[in-house]
C-alpha cells in the first residue's frame, strides 16, 4: 500500500521546475485569473523555507517592497505555477530563515554565492 501511494505522488510531482535551496532568490511566475481573463503574475523573493515533500511540497518566499516585508507561500506542484527561475544563489547556515521577518533594508539581505560554488549548488 505504501508503494502505491509513493508511486502516485511521484506521478503528480513536477520535474520541469528549477532546483533551488533556502537562501536563494527566485522568481515565480503564476497564472492569475481576473474576471474572464488570465495573466501571468511574477513574484520575486528570498526562499525562507521549504516544507513537506512529494506532491504537497511548499515554499515560502520573503520580499521587502516599499519598506514593508511580505511573505508568500506557493505549492510547488500546483498547475497555476508557470515557471520558477533562480535569480541568485544565497549562502546561509540555517534551514529556515524566519529571522528575516522583522528585518528591512540591509538587515534583510542574504550573502550571495559567486563563481563555481554557485554553479555547483
UniProtKB/Swiss-Prot annotation:
SUPFAM superfamilies named among the record's database cross-references: Translation proteins SH3-like domain
Keywords in alphabetical order: Ribonucleoprotein, Ribosomal protein
Gene Ontology MF terms: structural constituent of ribosome
Recorded superkingdom: Bacteria
Pfam families: Ribosomal_L19 (PF01245)
Keyword Disulfide bond: no
A cellular component annotation (GO) from this entry: cytosolic large ribosomal subunit
GO biological process: translation
PANTHER family according to UniProt: LARGE RIBOSOMAL SUBUNIT PROTEIN BL19M (PTHR15680:SF9), RIBOSOMAL PROTEIN L19 (PTHR15680)
Family classification: Belongs to the bacterial ribosomal protein bL19 family.
Entry function: This protein is located at the 30S-50S ribosomal subunit interface and may play a role in the structure and function of the aminoacyl-tRNA binding site.
Record-given protein name: Large ribosomal subunit protein bL19
Organism this protein belongs to: Chlamydia trachomatis serovar D (strain ATCC VR-885 / DSM 19411 / UW-3/Cx)
Amino acid at each position: 500500500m505504501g508503494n502505491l501511494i509513493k508511486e502516485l505522488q511521484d506521478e503528480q510531482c513536477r520535474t520541469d521546475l528549477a532546483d533551488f535551496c533556502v537562501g536563494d532568490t527566485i522568481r515565480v511566475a503564476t497564472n492569475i485569473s481576473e474576471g474572464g481573463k488570465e495573466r501571468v503574475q511574477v513574484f520575486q523573493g528570498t526562499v525562507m523555507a521549504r516544507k513537506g515533500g512529494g506532491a504537497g511540497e511548499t515554499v515560502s518566499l520573503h520580499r521587502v517592497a516599499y519598506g514593508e516585508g511580505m511573505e508568500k507561500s506557493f505549492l510547488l506542484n500546483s498547475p497555476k505555477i508557470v515557471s520558477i527561475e533562480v535569480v541568485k544563489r544565497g549562502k546561509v547556515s540555517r534551514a529556515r530563515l524566519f529571522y528575516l521577518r522583522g528585518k528591512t533594508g540591509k538587515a534583510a539581505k542574504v550573502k550571495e554565492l559567486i563563481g563555481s560554488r554557485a554553479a555547483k549548488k
